[in-house]
Amino acid sequence: MAPSSPRPALPALLVLLGALFPGPGNAQTSVSPPKVILPRGGSVQVTCSTSCDQPDLLGIETPLPKKELLLGGNNWKVYELSNVQEDSQPMCYSNCPDGQSTAKTFLTVYWTPERVELAPLPSWQPVGKDLTLRCQVEGGAPRANLTVVLLRGEKELKREPAVGEPAEVTTTVLVERDHHGANFSCRTELDLRPQGLQLFENTSAPHQLQTFVLPATPPQLVSPRVLEVDTQGTVVCSLDGLFPVLEAQVHLALGDQRLNPTVTYGNDSFSAKASVSVTAEDEGTQRLTCAVILGNQSRETLQTVTIYSFPAPNVILTKPEVSEGTEVTVKCEAHPRAKVTLNGVPAQPVGPRVQLLLKATPEDNGRSFSCSATLEVAGQLIHKNQTRELRVLYGPRLDERDCPGNWTWPENSQQTPMCQASGNPLPELKCLKDGTFPLPVGESVTVTRDLEGTYLCRARSTQGEVTRKVTVNVLSPRYEIVIITVVAAAVIMGTAGLSTYLYNRQRKIRKYRLQQAQKGTPMKPNTQATPP
């Protein structure tokens, strides 16, 4: 603000009056200073003077509060005008013998605007759209010296004189990505430098702009189309081309169940991954929603997920353990809408139940009965399986395959007698010679003469018992030489006899043919002559 005008010194004022009014003549009234610029509510001293020496009347006419100062002379007076709120034109007047006259001083009041306000910006502004900035200014004078400036940061966007009350200045800006986070403001400039004062500035509160880019394409949602009760599934929602991506909000929900995703951000993309658990209360068709909110816009993708309950099929045996020859019923039951097969045989008619009847045999022991159920859910085939095993109790068995009846081993050789009984439960097996000497079944032994003989093998279980005789022959070394010699001699004699027979036979055939040729009797083809 400019300081108040200084009070003129009395000697200087007198000199001035003497210079202005050097002698008598027509009466003239003067005012000093003729022009004043002062802050609103300020005070100013105004001097009124006249050219006559003895005026009948000298004063000032003004609506402003005034006070005559003591200093003064016959033809001049000094007044203090206070609380100047607006432009004013106080008028000095004088009444002299030779006439009346007046003079005005022009008071110009300056003050900065009472309100400089930038209209609120949208909370979010899409990139590529026009943004209108609007600034309103109330008050401020003199208006001829008042300018309104719109700014982005420190960059001027528009400058206009303040016109009207309130003054309003607008401009349009095409929003860009790099405008995100920029501050916009409005500033007034009251320039009184030409009047010897200064530049007065008032700036509005800044408004920060938030820009965004949200593509028109909906987010991509990947999830299972069907989900079984009491299981978990994974849902992934993603979208590319967002700005600023960290400001994007992602909402994932299955029906009324809000999911809690883990969000991973890229440069301009995100991926939200969440686990979803379903219970029997959720069974049926549910809506899966992925919504992305950025700025004042949103994009949404919907999918349907079918929640189903499908327990594994139930395989029922009359008894899991039966004796040989017992009638057994095997049943397979599943979900009412499922189709079942039992050991590959489908139900007739096709449905959720199938059964099989059989008479238990030893071959059925350990047999698995597999029930497969298939349920169609939302166009997908769901498969479940269940297997049960049948145990058949049957008596002991000893046969040639598992327990050979005759063994012939060389003396002093290492041998392992093998005899295994079958049955369920597994029978106890003992092989004894003369009721006391055991055969070391399954053990590696050195064959001696004591091992030779006939053993009675007895297999016993809760299902009965069975016996089988087993003979062990032990060959001593001398018997082996005799046997080898006899066998070799037999081979030699047999070979010699066969050679003699073949030689004599060929000789007789040639002799017969010669006799027939001498008699002139042709030989009959394909007829073999009988030897003499």
Swiss-Prot record:
Chief localization: membrane
SMART domains the UniProt entry points to: IG
Extracellular topological domain: 28-480
Motif (Cell attachment site): 152-154
Membrane topology label: Single-pass type I membrane protein
Pfam families for the chain: ICAM1_3_5_D2, ICAM_N
Signal peptide: 1-27
Residue pairs linked by disulfide bridges in the UniProt entry: 48-92, 52-96, 135-186, 237-290, 332-371, 403-419, 419-457, 431-457
GO biological processes: cell adhesion; cell-cell adhesion
Phosphothreonine found at: 521, 530
Topological domains annotated Cytoplasmic: 504-532
Glycosites: 145, 183, 202, 267, 296, 385, 406
Span of domain Ig-like C2-type: 41-103, 128-193, 230-297, 325-378, 412-464
GO MF term set: integrin binding
InterPro entries: ICAM, ICAM1_3_5_D2, ICAM_N, ICAM_VCAM, ICAM_VCAM_N, Ig-like_dom, Ig-like_dom_sf, Ig-like_fold
GO CC, one annotated term: plasma membrane
Modification comment: Monoubiquitinated, which is promoted by MARCH9 and leads to endocytosis.
Sorted UniProt keywords: Cell adhesion, Disulfide bond, Glycoprotein, Immunoglobulin domain, Membrane, Phosphoprotein, Repeat, Signal, Transmembrane, Transmembrane helix, Ubl conjugation
Compartments, as annotated in UniProt: Membrane
Transmembrane spans: 481-503
Function: ICAM proteins are ligands for the leukocyte adhesion protein LFA-1 (integrin alpha-L/beta-2). During leukocyte trans-endothelial migration, ICAM1 engagement promotes the assembly of endothelial apical cups through ARHGEF26/SGEF and RHOG activation.
Subunit note: Homodimer. Interacts with MUC1 and promotes cell aggregation in epithelial cells. Interacts with ARHGEF26/SGEF. Interacts (on T cell side) with CD81, CD247 and CD9 at immunological synapses between antigen-presenting cells and T cells.
Family, per entry: Belongs to the immunoglobulin superfamily. ICAM family.
Identification of the protein by name: Intercellular adhesion molecule 1
Lineage, uppermost ranks: Eukaryota, Metazoa, Chordata, Craniata, Vertebrata
